[in-house]
Amino acid sequence: MAEKFTQHTGLVVPLDAANVDTDAIIPKQFLQKVTRTGFGAHLFNDWRFLDDKGEQPNPEFVLNFPEYQGASILLARENFGCGSSREHAPWALTDYGFKVVIAPSFADIFYGNSFNNQLLPVTLSDEEVDEMFALVKANPGIRFEVDLEAQVVKAGDKSYSFSIDAFRRHCMLNGLDSIGLTLQHEDAIAAYEKKQPAFMG
């Protein structure tokens, strides 16, 4: 079972860039691991650090600004997560501590992979995202409240409605990953197996 997602209130960091691809999110040289942990250290590695080893933080990259330390909501521009289909991208984001990404649009494969890893991708209009960027930049350290049950983001004095596919919403609200979904039908699977002839194994 995955962690349930109902509501989340968190610090917002504005990544004012469009077409952020998966190689920027987690560069290919860090993909050797097969577990989901440890990727956060290399999130946006080529942007966060001035050296290949990740020892010299880039002071001009927004994730390194003191006011955004501990951010759990990423605000981005259109076509976030484009490029190759690596599932390591949402792994890196969640391992770093992100729970939500808000953008005008997402690459399809990244969008699906996010739900598989309990990372909520929230799609809003360009105008709404523009408003959020202005709000965050004017108020560094602001926190947004994301309510998946109500499908609303509360940002400052405004509320923004978003839409999520009913099945994906159900899975996130109940903490159901592919294993959890299978276990929901455990009794039916066991009953089916009992009916099978012994020679079928």
From Swiss-Prot:
It comes from Cronobacter sakazakii (strain ATCC BAA-894) (Enterobacter sakazakii). Its EC number is 4.2.1.33. It comes from the Bacteria. Catalyzes the isomerization between 2-isopropylmalate and 3-isopropylmalate, via the formation of 2-isopropylmaleate. GO terms for cellular component: 3-isopropylmalate dehydratase complex. This is 3-isopropylmalate dehydratase small subunit. It catalyses: (2R,3S)-3-isopropylmalate = (2S)-2-isopropylmalate. PANTHER family: 3-ISOPROPYLMALATE DEHYDRATASE SMALL SUBUNIT (PTHR43345:SF5), 3-ISOPROPYLMALATE DEHYDRATASE SMALL SUBUNIT 2-RELATED-RELATED (PTHR43345). Keywords: Amino-acid biosynthesis, Branched-chain amino acid biosynthesis, Leucine biosynthesis, Lyase. GO terms for molecular function: 3-isopropylmalate dehydratase activity. Belongs to the LeuD family. LeuD type 1 subfamily. Pathway: Amino-acid biosynthesis; L-leucine biosynthesis; L-leucine from 3-methyl-2-oxobutanoate: step 2/4. Heterodimer of LeuC and LeuD. InterPro entries: 3-IsopropMal_deHydase_ssu (IPR004431), Aconitase/3IPM_dehydase_swvl (IPR015928), AconitaseA/IPMdHydase_ssu_swvl (IPR000573), IPMI_Swivel (IPR033940), LeuD (IPR050075). GO terms for biological process: L-leucine biosynthetic process. CDD domains: IPMI_Swivel. The keyword Membrane does not apply. The gene is leuD. Gene3D superfamilies: Aconitase, domain 4. It holds the Pfam family Aconitase_C. The keyword Cytoplasm does not apply.
